[in-house]
Every structure is written in structure tokens, then in C-alpha cells.
Amino acid sequence: MSRKGPSKKHVVLPDPIYGSTVVAQLINKILLDGKKSIAEDIVYSALDMVKEKSDQEPVAVLKRALDNIRPSLEVRSRRVGGATYQVPVEVKPNRANTLSLRWLTDFSRARREKTMAERLANEILDASNGLGASVKRREDTHKMAEANKAFAHYRW
């Protein structure tokens, strides 16, 4: 462990168009090979598509989608006496945000639409309505935690 104290958290500055740190974090998750301008184009065009399709504020739809994806429980492996148990633990808020953004981008990339902006927009819309692969991932995570509730006393 570090003797210098806890590591400093990286502060993400809000994006220039919507003034939202959530959008800035999404841009950073979409980012590949350091091409930030391309990532910004993808996210902003996806949010424009969300606005066209839903007639609602795109940042509000994105936040609702992330709330639907955000896990509250997960399982972590704990080795006890030669056996490895899947122990359910609560997810810290920072990790929950990171997981929801990661799942949103990963399952957007796995979709079948033609452009990444379309995939991201449709995944955001699906997640805001409680559908889509990213919401299913959260449900599966919660089911795993529920199934292993018997090992909750091993948590640390």
C-alpha cells in the first residue's frame, strides 16, 4: 500500500456544449487511440439523435439511462480455506458510475447499427426505457449477488 496517503481522484471537466461532466466522461469512455475529436463527434451526434427520437433533453435521457444501468450490488471473489466464494458487496458510487458508462459503451459497440453514433443513441434510448443489453447486464449482476447472499457474511 502507498505510504503517501490516498491517491488523488482525477477531476473531469464538463464538456463545452452541454456543460455536463457525465457527457465528458462518456466522451472519454468512447475515446479510442487518443482521437478525442472523433469521440466528441460520435457522442454529440448520438445525443442529437436522442433528442430527435425522444423529443426530450438528451442529457436528461442519458442520466436516466445511466441510472437504469447503475448497479447497486456486485459479487467479488473471496478465497476462504481453499474455496473461492462469490461474495455480494455494495458498489461504491464512483465505481457504479464507471461500470454504467463502461457497460453503455461496450454494449453500444456490440450493436448492429451502421454507425457508432446510431448504436450509442439507440442503446441510450433503450437503457432509458429499461431495455437493452446494458440494463440486462445490471439485472444479471444483481441476480448473481442475490443468488450468493448466503456468503454475505464473508464480505470485508
Curated annotation (Swiss-Prot):
Keywords: Ribonucleoprotein, Ribosomal protein, RNA-binding, rRNA-binding, tRNA-binding
MF GO annotations: rRNA binding; structural constituent of ribosome; tRNA binding
Domain of life: Bacteria
SUPFAM superfamilies given in the database record: Ribosomal protein S7
A GO CC annotation given for this chain: small ribosomal subunit
Single Gene Ontology BP annotation: translation
One Pfam short name: Ribosomal_S7
InterPro entries, sorted: Ribosomal_uS7, Ribosomal_uS7_bac/org-type, Ribosomal_uS7_CS, Ribosomal_uS7_dom, Ribosomal_uS7_dom_sf
Family membership: Belongs to the universal ribosomal protein uS7 family.
SUBUNIT field: Part of the 30S ribosomal subunit. Contacts proteins S9 and S11.
Function: One of the primary rRNA binding proteins, it binds directly to 16S rRNA where it nucleates assembly of the head domain of the 30S subunit. Is located at the subunit interface close to the decoding center, probably blocks exit of the E-site tRNA.
HAMAP family recorded: Ribosomal_uS7_B
Name recorded for this polypeptide: Small ribosomal subunit protein uS7
Species annotation: Bifidobacterium longum (strain NCC 2705)
